[in-house]
Amino acid sequence: MPLPFEQFQGKGVLGFLDSSSSPGYKIWANPEKLHGRVEEDLCFVVNNGGFSEPTSVLDSVRSPSPFVSSSTTTLSSSHGGPSGGGAAAATFSGADGKCDQMGFEDLDGVLSGGSPGQEQSIFRLIMAGDVVDPGSEFVGFDIGSGSDPVIDNPNPLFGYGFPFQNAPEEEKFQISINPNPGFFSDPPSSPPAKRLNSGQPGSQHLQWVFPFSDPGHESHDPFLTPPKIAGEDQNDQDQSAVIIDQLFSAAAELTTNGGDNNPVLAQGILARLNHNLNNNNDDTNNNPKPPFHRAASYITEALHSLLQDSSLSPPSLSPPQNLIFRIAAYRAFSETSPFLQFVNFTANQTILESFEGFDRIHIVDFDIGYGGQWASLIQELAGKRNRSSSAPSLKITAFASPSTVSDEFELRFTEENLRSFAGETGVSFEIELLNMEILLNPTYWPLSLFRSSEKEAIAVNLPISSMVSGYLPLILRFLKQISPNVVVCSDRSCDRNNDAPFPNGVINALQYYTSLLESLDSGNLNNAEAATSIERFCVQPSIQKLLTNRYRWMERSPPWRSLFGQCGFTPVTLSQTAETQAEYLLQRNPMRGFHLEKRQSSSPSLVLCWQRKELVTVSAWKC
């Protein structure tokens, strides 16, 4: 029976995952258990360079059975009883490292705030902007079958609200962003090891090991001139120039080889920068800082976390309540900016067009998030089933690289809500969660990843921002083997400078996120808390992830489009329907300044821009 949200207010974590009583969490904070082992995004190493045994279903896979999770939902599945709907999020039991099972009905009740008799799925809350009323009218998202649209929004799902939005001030949770980067290991039978970025001097126990040979490039040139960002007047230009120079210098000191004083110099630069950003931008009159200064502040924090080498510390626990706030921020971002819906709907339209005539659909997703992208796809398949009494079955294989308990909790949460949503719509559905590390060695590639019959179509969702650049060739090698019908990629301008030194990448990130924050400010959000939530739970972690990945992989690598071409992939022109749908999406959005560009260069793509500044690009590829 769903538990009311009030029962959980004021607690450190949700009642059924209380860190004060659950020994499962203590394994992550126990220095004895953590000594000699650091978990990585893709794998982990130990002091002697060997591999430790996995203690979680999402730990590194070392056996021929690399499954994280596999579940199936069909029309006949039961979603309330222990056999059908009892999805589980994993918590760690301290003794054996195995996962305890926890029901999601409780969390769903917490998030929806509804009574036991009220059908309110949190997945509907997440996807209020992506799932639409089947009765709405729209000329897009049609693959020739007269299917209903997916982006028109007089939607009853918007009627649901988060019960915690108006919580009393004293009862609101205190949230902290806990970036948890890790290290890369060299799996069995992988290519030769790569030169390391050793981080702080004196860090001798933990080695950063990479699976590629050194191409012969120096990792950076700290004396390159940073690009400039113009302000509104001469004073703003002068202030911006100082901030850019300080960020560039701090990044250069972080990455200069040799010299034990470099971290000290970087720390001093960042301290002065933080002081200048705070003194020059007084928001005592409730005037928010300009986007440029906010972006600079977030980047300063990210560089400081790299300076502190927080990756060597035990991972900080992220309470399950953080998931609630991240979902709220995700929804606010989706409702405010066309960014997420543009990416999701354009990708889904391209995927649907590649699936016509197939009985089975297999999605390989490298960034499943909360699963929201697939809500409209599931709804479209349900619509086809209602029109023709038959529809393709859907399977999703999600590659994940969780590094904390909360990540695994989030994945299980996503899995359960996708299964429940598919069950409600009557779509035959399977989902499998796999550790991304298995792709580093073909020995561990499960047969379930390959096409099972000629009637099965495979599509890949590959956001470039979800990849560490050095691992992209290995991912493409795997994709070449499964021969997908289409690979849909989304990327941002800050994802394309892997051939530039790290300091230049920092300035490129500053430019990009300044534009993104400017676009969000143009929406004039009436809810200041929503604006703060978007930046705290969407923008700031994105900056941290971008710079952490760049810092971990210093070697310059070719542009990702060049790698696609070298691996045998060719670009595909996006359809007129996809373009029309994207145009309509922008027309519906109340925010002005966004526009669409269609590029027909070496790789045709649709580009979402704001004030002629590129925000995100979607392209399609085939092999």
UniProtKB/Swiss-Prot annotation:
Segments for region (PFYRE): 458-545
Region SAW, residue ranges: 548-622
Tissue-wise expression: Expressed in seedlings, roots, leaves and flowers.
Gene Ontology molecular-function annotations: DNA-binding transcription factor activity
Low complexity: compositionally biased ranges: 63-80
Record family assignment: Belongs to the GRAS family.
Name of the molecule in the record: Scarecrow-like protein 22
Lineage of origin: Eukaryota, Viridiplantae, Streptophyta, Embryophyta, Tracheophyta
Gene: SCL22
